Structure formats: structure tokens, C-alpha cells
Amino acid sequence: MPAVKRKAPPTLGAKLNRRVRPRFEAEPDSDVEEGSSDEAPSEEEGGGFHTGSDTEEEEDEEVEEGSDDESDAPSEHGGAGIDAAQLSFGALAKAQASLGTLKKKKKGSKGGDDESDDDEEKEEPNWKTEIEKGLKSKVEKHHRTSKHAPVEMTSKKPVSRRREFLVTNDAPAKPKARDPRFAPPGLGGSISGGSKAVVDEIKARKAYSFLDDYQEDEMKQLRMAIKKTKDAHEKEELQRALLSMESKKKARVRKDKERELLSEHKKKEKELIKQGKTPFYLKKSEQKKQLLVEQFASMKKSQVDKAIERKRKKIAGKEKKALPFARRTAEDR
């Protein structure tokens, strides 16, 4: 028997793009059909079967050839020859899904090309635009967002290109500008000290003297809370807060006394200078002595004795710490 070549099954694309041809069956005349059936039923049956099989094979070949041609056609002409009215809804849905994936792939390839072009453009520096930007940034002035907003100033100050290679002691020192936000409160931004700093501190102390009354009230409330509370941990915290407030108050009072002492001494010296005498400036040690004299003058005898004993113990402890340790001898071993 001769070997029969089997055709390969059509692919999914060929099935989807296959052209379906409708079969038009003409309505046969009843008289002709009856006559033909009576005359030669066996011949028509045999011939009809043979001719039908031949026609079916020819149609299959045509369909396969058409499917092959049409499968190649969409790639070349974009699928213009397909009639959508002759396809089923399932075939159309599958075709639409396959077209969507193709479009995405094409877009991705285009996007990659664009990105590569952008990278190439970025790599090539445009010197003119950079120079123009630098000039614009220099020309641009700081402006306010609204008329009520504060003026915006840059914190970046350029360093001077001039170098002072010859510095003499006779030349006056230039005042260094400092940010007033980082200055101690009450000094008005002058960190270096001097008369201005002292004056500003005195003014601030006078302006905020009403805070002493508030602090006294807070200390009274803390004492009352310490008496009422039974929790040991909370009591310790309140006592610590009260102790810190009392120590701050003592330091403030001591500073006020020092300031009063200096102001009185300056007044006396000014009067003596007017009389033609030379001025006398108090040293730090003299200031401390006068402060101790005034402090003991306002205290009772028992309080003075206690203060002296406390001071003596403090000095003795410092002296003991300053002494070197005794060396070990053979007897100590």
C-alpha cells in the first residue's frame, strides 16, 4: 500500500484566522428529486458519496491553504483581509488578547529606546544651559511669599578671598557677628561680654522680675503636694524639683547681691573721681570678702557658726584629697 502523508494539525493562529465559508444549499425541485430517486438510486448514492468526499477533501485543502496564507497575511498586512462577521465570539476574544500582548511588547521596546535616547542626551552636558542657570541663581533675589512674611535670607556667606598675612596687635579686633538665637537669654546676642552684655542682663532681670512671684507660688504648691502625697517615688520626684528651684533661687539672690555691691562701689568711685582722686577697681577676691561680710551680718550667731563649720569641713576634705598617698614600707607588707 502506498504511504499516505498525514498533514500536520493546524496551529492556534491558523485556527483563529481561518476563513469560514458558508455553504449555500439550493432548494431542489420536488419533481426532479422524486424522478431521480426512482430512476437510479444506487448510482446517485454511490456517485454522490464519492463526489462528496472529493469535494470535502478539496475544501479542507483550500481551507488549510487559506489558513496558511492568512496566518502569514496578518504579519505582512496587519490582518486587513479577515472578516470579523464570519468569526465566532470566542475566536475574536482570543485574537484580541493576543493583539493586546503584542501591543504591550511593542510599547515596551519603544519605551526602552526612548530611555536609551534620554540617557544619551543626559550624558551629553549642555554647557550653555548650565552657565545660564548659574547666572540666574546669582541674579535671583530673595523675596517674601507675602507682604506680612519675614524676609528670607541665606545662611551661606561667601568667604573673602583676601588673606591677612600681616596681623599686628595694634590693629583693633573686628567684632564677630553671631546669631542671636544661640546667645544666652538676656545677653542680646553679645557673647564676648563687656559692658553691653552686663547692661542687657540687668535690663532682662528687671523686665522679668515678676517671674520670681510665680516661682514662689510654684514652690508653695510643691511643698503642699509633698505633704499630701503618699507614694514614695512621686514624693522623691517632687522633692528633687523643689530642691532645684530653691538652689536656682539662691543663685539668683547671690547674683543680685553681687550686682548691687558692684553698682554701689561704682557710684562711690564716680564721686571720688569727681573730687580728683584715682579710681579703685575691686578684685574678685575683694568682692567675695565683702559679700561674706554682708551675708554674716544678716545671719544669727548660731547660723554663722554652722556656716563657718561647714566651710571648714569643705576645705579640709579638699586638702585631704590633694595629699599624696603614703608609700608602703616593709612593715606594711
Curated annotation (Swiss-Prot):
Region entry Disordered, spans: 1-85, 99-194, 242-262, 313-333
Keyword entries, A-Z: Coiled coil, Nucleus, Ribonucleoprotein, Ribosome biogenesis, rRNA processing
Domain of life: Eukaryota
Protein's cellular compartments: Nucleus, Nucleolus
Pfam families per the UniProt record, alphabetical: RRP36
Biological process per Gene Ontology, one example term: maturation of SSU-rRNA from tricistronic rRNA transcript (SSU-rRNA, 5.8S rRNA, LSU-rRNA)
Start-end of Acidic residues biased regions: 27-46, 54-73, 114-123
Residues in coiled coil: 215-275
GO cellular component: 90S preribosome; nucleolus
Compositional bias ranges of the Basic and acidic residues kind: 124-138, 316-333
Similarity comment: family membership: Belongs to the RRP36 family.
UniProt subunit comment: Associates with 90S and pre-40S pre-ribosomal particles.
Function description: Component of the 90S pre-ribosome involved in the maturation of rRNAs. Required for early cleavages of the pre-RNAs in the 40S ribosomal subunit maturation pathway.
PANTHER family the record matches: RIBOSOMAL RNA PROCESSING PROTEIN 36 HOMOLOG (PTHR21738:SF0)
Protein name per Swiss-Prot or TrEMBL: rRNA biogenesis protein RRP36
Organism the protein comes from: Sordaria macrospora (strain ATCC MYA-333 / DSM 997 / K(L3346) / K-hell)
